[in-house]
């Protein structure tokens, strides 16, 4: 599978909404929530996710992940003089487990050069944590919600 990154553009909003809503639905177990509550709360999650990434990491670059030319995910990367930080990464649920996330991480690692590459992963997301550990990240701390992970150059 050929995995590439391209810059996010305004025309990607429908794809991002679908991706974020599907991801959050799985994260929160929202499949069984009654409508219209489900749509309303997932819409709030979509807006909050986009807004918080832009406020917390001004200057971060949002990428659409493509697998064999089709939109497959989203990666937000914030680069400073001192570090490269993966702010967010999502892959469509039906495409998970196919190496797309690993390919994105490898690409970002290559751009990190001589800087540490840092990220956070939810304490409940053991699959992502194992992936990051396989790719050379180690846990450097944790809070009530997430592990802090780092890969040194």
Please describe what each predicted stretch is.
Residues 83, 116-118:
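Structural preference for beta-strand elements that scaffold enzyme active sites
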């Amino acid at each position: 599978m050929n995995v590439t990154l391209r810059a996010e553009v305004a025309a990607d909003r429908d794809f991002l909404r679908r991706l974020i809503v599907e991801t959050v639905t799985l994260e929160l177990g929202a499949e069984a929530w009654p409508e219209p509550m489900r749509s309303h709360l997932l819409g709030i999650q979509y807006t909050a996710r986009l807004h918080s990434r832009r406020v917390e990491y001004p200057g971060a670059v949002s990428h659409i992940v493509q697998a064999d030319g089709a939109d497959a995910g989203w990666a937000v990367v914030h680069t400073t003089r001192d570090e490269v930080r993966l702010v967010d990464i999502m892959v469509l649920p039906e495409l998970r487990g196919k190496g797309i996330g690993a390919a994105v991480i490898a690409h970002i690692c290559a751009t990190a050069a001589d800087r540490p590459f840092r990220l956070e992963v939810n304490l409940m997301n053991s699959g992502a944590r194992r992936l990051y550990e396989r790719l050379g990240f180690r846990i450097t701390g944790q809070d009530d919600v997430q592990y802090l992970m780092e890969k040194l150059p």
